[in-house]
UniProtKB/Swiss-Prot annotation:
High-level lineage: Bacteria, Pseudomonadati, Pseudomonadota, Alphaproteobacteria, Hyphomicrobiales
Similarity-based family: Belongs to the UPF0235 family.
Source superkingdom: Bacteria
SMART domains, per database record: DUF167 (SM01152)
Gene3D superfamilies associated with the record: YggU-like
Any one Pfam family match given in the protein's UniProt record, by short name: DUF167
Organism: Rhizobium leguminosarum bv. trifolii (strain WSM2304)
Residues in the signal sequence: none
Protein's recorded name: UPF0235 protein Rleg2_3707
């Protein structure tokens, strides 16, 4: 299975599919869409207005990986369900944390 992240020199780019108003804040695993692109399924309880769901997503990812939320930023998908996050840090370490997170 493809992994929903790509390692760079000093960061990782993580593909996300976010469901706002999802009942709880959670990471529901990785999936692949019809085009073969992998993404991390996530949901937050926050409503999708004025960037609230994006902020909740960044907090969820940072907390799940045990990193500062300032290390996580939204690269694309501000108003879309599919998003790309940039996570600053050691790519090898982040890759291991993401592998552990997915089980």
């Amino acid at each position: 299975m493809n992994r929903p992240w790509k390692k760079s020199d000093d960061h990782v780019r993580l593909a996300i599919r976010l469901t706002p108003n999802g009942g709880r804040d959670a990471i529901d695993g990785a999936e692949t869409d019809g085009e073969g692109e992998a993404y991390l399924k996530t949901r937050v309880t926050t409503v999708p207005e004025k960037g609230k769901a994006n902020k909740a997503l960044i907090l969820l990812i940072a907390k799940s990986l045990g990193i500062a939320k300032s290390s996580v930023s939204l690269v694309s998908g501000d108003t879309a369900r599919k998003k790309i996050l940039r996570i600053d840090g050691d790519p090898e370490d982040l890759g291991k944390k993401l592998e552990t997170l997915l089980g």
